[in-house]
Each structure stands twice: as C-alpha cells, then as structure tokens.
Design a protein with these regions (language model features):
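ATP-binding/phosphotransfer module of carbohydrate and carboxylate kinases, centering on a glycine-rich
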Residues: 31-171
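Phosphate-binding/catalytic loop of phosphoryl-transfer enzymes
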Residues: 1-44
Length: 171
C-alpha cells in the first residue's frame, strides 16, 4: 500500500497459470527433478528417496499419475514442499536450487507491485504457509527480494491471517 492507500497485487492467479514460489510450485519442481534424475537428465538428489517415501511408492513411475491425474494434484503436489525444504536443510543441492529458483521467480511480483504503486523503499510483507513454515525458504526469498529492490525492508505479517480475515469481515 502506498501513501495514498492504493494497494497492488501481482501473481497468485492459481496453480495452473501463476503460482511461482508457492508450495505447489516447489512440489512440482521437486517432482520434475526426481523424474529428471531417474532418466539421467538431471543430477541425483536426496529428493528421490524422500518423495518416494512421502508418497509411499517404490519407484518414480507412478509420480505422473499420483500428481497429475486424480483431481487433487495441487494439494498432493503442495504437500511435497516440506520434503523439499527438509532435503535442502540437510544439504541436498538440487533441493536448495529449487528453493532459490522458486524465490527468484516469486520476487519480481513484489517489484511489479512496488513499481505500480511508485514505492521507492517499500516494506514487503512475505506471507503464506511456505514462508511461515520454512525459515530457510523465508531467508532465501528475503535475499531474492533484496537483490531486486535494494532499499526494501522485508518482514513477516504484523498480525495473524485470522486477524486479517476478521478485519475484512467487518468491512
């Protein structure tokens, strides 16, 4: 929000069209990395064993059906995000690269809003389940944001989402 009360938004238009940096995006990137590792197009990754265990399967073969053909693919895919962050915290380079790539894809949304609202030194509030649950991803996202908008300050929400919902309900 700028000094005139104008608000801006960029991104967040659903998992099919635009969900860069979300839990679903991380899960999709992780599944892609596992499939590429399995056929030799990508490097080996700790994600393979972690995702197979998480999904209770013995090989990569059922991943496309499990994550894309049952109508609940967005939820199932998003549920892989904690697997990615855990593997990154354990030093898996592929997982760390996924976090960095997702944050780099999300950060331009904040820049677009800052530019649209004419904010030179914006305060960016990073919210969402993934940001809240993973200090590592939050730090990577903060760094990506500061690379794009040097004078920005990045913080978490001041109030809970329930507080925000209550305020909206009062309007």
């Amino acid at each position: 929000r700028n000094q005139h009360g104008d608000e801006g938004r960029a991104g967040g238009h659903g998992s099919f069209l635009d969900d860069m940096g979300s839990a679903t995006d991380l899960g999709r990137r992780a599944a892609q990395a596992v499939l590429r590792a399995s056929d030799g197009r990508g490097p080996p990754t700790a994600l393979t064993a972690a995702i197979l265990a998480h999904l209770h399967v013995e090989s990569e073969a059922p991943l496309p059906a499990l994550l894309g053909a049952r109508g609940d693919e967005r939820t199932r895919t998003a549920q892989l995000a904690p697997v990615v962050t855990a593997a990154a915290e354990q030093g898996d380079q592929v997982s760390l690269d996924i976090l960095k790539d997702a944050a780099a894809a999300l950060a331009p949304s904040a820049l677009a809003v800052a530019n649209r609202l004419g904010l030179k030194k914006p305060t960016i509030v990073a919210v969402g389940g993934l940001v809240a649950s993973s200090p590592l991803y939050r730090d990577i996202l903060h760094a990506a944001l500061l690379r794009l908008i040097e004078d920005a300050s990045v913080q978490g929400p001041v109030h809970s989402s329930a507080y925000g919902a209550a305020l909206l309900a009062l309007r």
